[in-house]
């Protein structure tokens, strides 16, 4: 196993995750099997209970792990599936070590950061890397490890010490360190290297040396700037990689390839360069022949909360040669005029009461005005509530989560008595059986599918017959549980309890999103 560790300096938010995912993609394009690990130095066990407005999207993995959004980038760029083992947090590491100490596993030793915490980190990285198998049964040859945060952060210190030990243990040929740093421009447009020099100095103080430096900038990095960084930071000039901001993140692997990243990295890892597979580049470089505008009705004002939805729309749009322009509409602030200008409406997932009535009003507008609609998770539940109120006749229909009224949406039976909120929802992959005559079955090309879930509530079985008698059909089920719905007399009114966006890939767009984008495009053509 060979390891590529990606660290960051100067400031957070530079795009380490996209850089790590892009490195994985160019290595796959050279014929290698690659997996990824993300280290998040926070004390939370996982991302499940973190405020999405602060942390961004909670990405759900196939085994039910609730992870950082970078795991979603890895899955999309590398076209792989990961598990909760591939997301390490300080909370997981310390919890495991303390549990082992209580169990007596350390045989009376004084438990310390070094060696016990660092050994736990290394063991978990190694386990995640070596246990991963792709859909064809291939084991990974290279593991990309992204260390969250910035070099110098106190939270990252045990992880960086573990990385230092890994470098010593594996040595050149099996280990490479890629450091992502900021190259800010002054008022004259010249890129400044001093922050990078200080960042490399901080890295050295921890016993680490960068093998490759990736300079993030809105401008191209000149050869003279690369030479300056090379001279001050002791890396080969060819190992100073320009990472100029790209108009589309899926173009980043192409830009890194042009900069020679793959050749430098493979040389460091003592691997053959191999022939580049250009399939990825043809996949992401398609031309658009049409354009649609989709409104996403949001509870949270941060686009990163909905990154998988945004990417799934992009995947479907590319597949259909249709550019998807997204209008982000606050559920509490939008107007009917905002909805009238859209080609389609998407209601995403979320929790809590805020913005719910605005989402329900948008669903009613889409139903009555025959505007394509896709509802996801909470969006699915709100479609049921809107229909119960305005068609079935229960004016006080609501969710048990929201308060008093007719509970069209009820708590899952297995959630009764659950006290801990973390990791206790219905999470991860579950099978869904589709009605063979449904639109979704046609889109999936199958009646038995698997999708990812994240919810505590479901359609109340008491009202299913009444709802279906009025024309809303539940076309996807898991046993007695309702998983998907459609309206027959509508161009595209589809909602799912599951999250199809989490399994969407550039090469394999999500079926509900394909249907949604296609319906939006047809609606626009008719206008």
Swiss-Prot record:
Stretches assigned to the Glutamine amidotransferase type-1 domain: 294-526
Record-linked Gene3D superfamilies: 3.40.50.880, P-loop containing nucleotide triphosphate hydrolases
Keyword Ligase belongs to the record: yes
Single GO term (MF): identical protein binding
Pathway assigned to this chain's UniProt record: Pyrimidine metabolism; CTP biosynthesis via de novo pathway; CTP from UDP: step 2/2
Reaction equation(s) it catalyzes: UTP + L-glutamine + ATP + H2O = CTP + L-glutamate + ADP + phosphate + 2 H(+); L-glutamine + H2O = L-glutamate + NH4(+); UTP + NH4(+) + ATP = CTP + ADP + phosphate + 2 H(+)
GO biological processes: 'de novo' CTP biosynthetic process; pyrimidine nucleobase biosynthetic process
Subunit composition and interactions: Homotetramer.
UniProt gene name: pyrG
Name under which the protein is recorded: CTP synthase
Organism annotation: Methanocorpusculum labreanum (strain ATCC 43576 / DSM 4855 / Z)
E.C. number(s) listed in UniProt: 6.3.4.2
Family, per entry: Belongs to the CTP synthase family.
Keywords of the record: ATP-binding, Glutamine amidotransferase, Ligase, Magnesium, Metal-binding, Nucleotide-binding, Pyrimidine biosynthesis
Task of the protein: Catalyzes the ATP-dependent amination of UTP to CTP with either L-glutamine or ammonia as the source of nitrogen. Regulates intracellular CTP levels through interactions with the four ribonucleotide triphosphates.
């Amino acid at each position: 196993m060979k390891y590529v560790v990606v660290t960051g300096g100067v400031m957070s938010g530079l795009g380490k995750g996209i850089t790590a995912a892009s490195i994985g993609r160019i290595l796959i394009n050279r014929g290698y099997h690659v997996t990824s690990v993300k280290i998040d130095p926070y004390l939370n066990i996982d991302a499940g209970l973190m405020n999405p407005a602060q942390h961004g999207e909670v990405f759900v993995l196939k085994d039910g792990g609730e992870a950082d959004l970078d795991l979603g980038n890895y899955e999309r760029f590398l076209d792989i599936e990961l598990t909760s083992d591939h997301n390490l947090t300080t909370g997981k590491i310390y919890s495991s070590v303390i549990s082992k100490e209580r169990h007596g596993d350390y045989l009376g030793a004084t438990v310390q950061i070094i060696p016990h915490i660092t050994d736990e980190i290394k063991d978990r990285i190694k386990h995640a890397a070596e246990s991963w198998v792709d859909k064809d049964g291939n084991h990974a040859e290279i593991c990309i490890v992204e260390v969250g945060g910035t070099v110098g952060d106190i939270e990252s210190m045990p992880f960086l010490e573990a990385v230092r030990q890994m470098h010593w243990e594996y040595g050149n040929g099996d280990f490479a360190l890629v450091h992502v740093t900021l190259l800010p421009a002054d008022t004259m447009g010249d890129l400044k290297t001093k922050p990078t020099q200080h960042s490399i100095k901080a890295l050295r103080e921890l016993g680490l040396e960068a093998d490759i430096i990736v300079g993030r900038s809105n401008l191209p990095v000149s050869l003279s700037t690369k030479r300056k960084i090379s001279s001050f930071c002791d890396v080969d000039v060819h190992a100073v990689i320009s990472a100029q901001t790209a108009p589309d993140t899926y173009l980043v692997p192409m830009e890194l390839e042009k900069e020679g990243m793959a050749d430098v990295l493979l040389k460091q890892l003592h691997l053959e360069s191999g022939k580049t597979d250009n399939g990825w580049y043809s996949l992401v470089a398609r031309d658009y022949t049409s354009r649609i505008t989709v409104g996403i009705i949001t509870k949270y004002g941060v686009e990163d909360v909905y990154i998988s939805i945004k990417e799934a729309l992009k995947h479907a749009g590319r597949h259909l040669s249709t550019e998807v322009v997204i209008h982000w509409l606050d559920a509490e602030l939008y107007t009917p005029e905002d909805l009238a200008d859209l080609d389609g409406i998407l209601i995403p997932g979320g929790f809590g009461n805020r913005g719910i009535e605005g989402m329900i009003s948008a669903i009613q507008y889409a139903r009555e005005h025959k505007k394509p609609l896709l509802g996801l998770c909470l969006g699915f539940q709100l479609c049921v509530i809107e229909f119960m109120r305005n068609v079935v006749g229960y004016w006080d229909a609501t969710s048990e989560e929201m308060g008093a009224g007719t509970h069209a949406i009820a708590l899952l039976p297995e959630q009764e008595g659950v006290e801990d909120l973390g990791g206790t929802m219905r999470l991860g992959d579950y099978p869904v059986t589709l009605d063979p005559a449904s639109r979704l079955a046609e889109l999936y090309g199958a009646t038995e599918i698997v999708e990812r879930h994240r919810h505590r509530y479901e359609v109340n079985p008491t009202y299913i017959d009444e709802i279906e008698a009025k024309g809303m059909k539940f076309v996807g089920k898991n046993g007695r549980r309702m998983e998907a719905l459609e309206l027959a007399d509508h161009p595209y009114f589809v909602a799912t309890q599951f999250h199809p966006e989490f399994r969407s890939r550039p090469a394999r767009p999500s079926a509900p999103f394909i249907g949604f984008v296609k319906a939006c495009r047809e609606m626009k053509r008719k206008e």
